[in-house]
Each structure stands twice: as structure tokens, then as C-alpha cells.
Amino acid sequence: MIQIDFNKMGGLIPAIIQDYQNGEVLMVAFMDEKTLNLTLETGKTWFFSRSRNKYWMKGEESGNTQEVMEVLTDCDADTVVIKVKQNGPAACHTGNRSCFYVKWENGQWVEHSKPLFDPAQVYKK
């Protein structure tokens, strides 16, 4: 039986979050064993924030949750791809559909999308 290898990165694995319909990469985050199990049990994506040192469910503040459609692991069992139905307009905390909205072009990084919501309004702190 395949076991996910959490040892290579100090208890964490990268989780690539992908739109299940069109294959767009929405975000990359980190999971530990607890958040992977929460994701598998609840059908919602859960992550471990390295900067805040806490667990979080995608959309818990914004309402832009992710419904898990399929989970895959790579040949080394140390990374997962989670295909999701994105509920709400955007996966990125900046308000963009994807966290990957900046493209290398003509020797510089260029933003290629506009936010779909105002983060200052959504994340009132």
C-alpha cells in the first residue's frame, strides 16, 4: 500500500491545486498529515500555513472554498495534486482566479489578470 512520505520536507508536502474542469493551476500550498487527512475526510482543501504556523481551510475567511474532486500523488509519494471545483470567483488571496497570474515576458514579470474581488473588503482585519 502506498504511504505519503511526509519526511523529506520536515513533515510537509507540496499540494498543487488544479481546476478539475480546465486543468488550470490555481495555487500551491503545503500540507502535513493532519491537513491531508482533513482534506480527504471533509472534501474541502485544508493546508498548513508556514508563515502563520497554523491550519486553515481554503475559503474559511473569503468564502471561496474548494470542493475536492480527485487527489493524486506522484511516483515518490511526496507531492499531491488535488483537482477541485473552485467555489467563488478566485483561489488567490489577491482576488485573482489563480495565484499564477504573473508571467515572465520580455525580461520582466507582468501581471496578466485583474482581481475578481477586492481583498481589502473580503479580508477585513
From Swiss-Prot:
EC number: 3.5.4.19
A GO CC term assigned to this protein in UniProt: cytoplasm
A GO MF term: zinc ion binding
Source superkingdom: Bacteria
Keywords in alphabetical order: Amino-acid biosynthesis, Cytoplasm, Histidine biosynthesis, Hydrolase, Magnesium, Metal-binding, Zinc
GO BP terms, alphabetized: L-histidine biosynthetic process
One Pfam entry name: PRA-CH
Catalysed conversion reaction: 1-(5-phospho-beta-D-ribosyl)-5'-AMP + H2O = 1-(5-phospho-beta-D-ribosyl)-5-[(5-phospho-beta-D-ribosylamino)methylideneamino]imidazole-4-carboxamide
Swiss-Prot/TrEMBL cofactor(s): Mg(2+); Zn(2+)
Coiled coil regions in record: none
Enzyme class: hydrolase
Pathway: Amino-acid biosynthesis; L-histidine biosynthesis; L-histidine from 5-phospho-alpha-D-ribose 1-diphosphate: step 3/9
Binding residues annotated for Zn(2+), in chain numbering: C75, C92, C99
UniProt remark on cofactor binding: Binds 1 Mg(2+) ion per subunit. Binds 1 zinc ion per subunit.
Location of the protein in the cell: Cytoplasm
Family per record: Belongs to the PRA-CH family.
PANTHER family the UniProt entry points to: HISTIDINE BIOSYNTHESIS BIFUNCTIONAL PROTEIN (PTHR42945), HISTIDINE BIOSYNTHESIS BIFUNCTIONAL PROTEIN HIS7 (PTHR42945:SF1)
Entry function: Catalyzes the hydrolysis of the adenine ring of phosphoribosyl-AMP.
Subunit structure as annotated in this protein's UniProt entry: Homodimer.
Name recorded for this polypeptide: Phosphoribosyl-AMP cyclohydrolase
Annotated organism of origin: Pelobacter propionicus (strain DSM 2379 / NBRC 103807 / OttBd1)
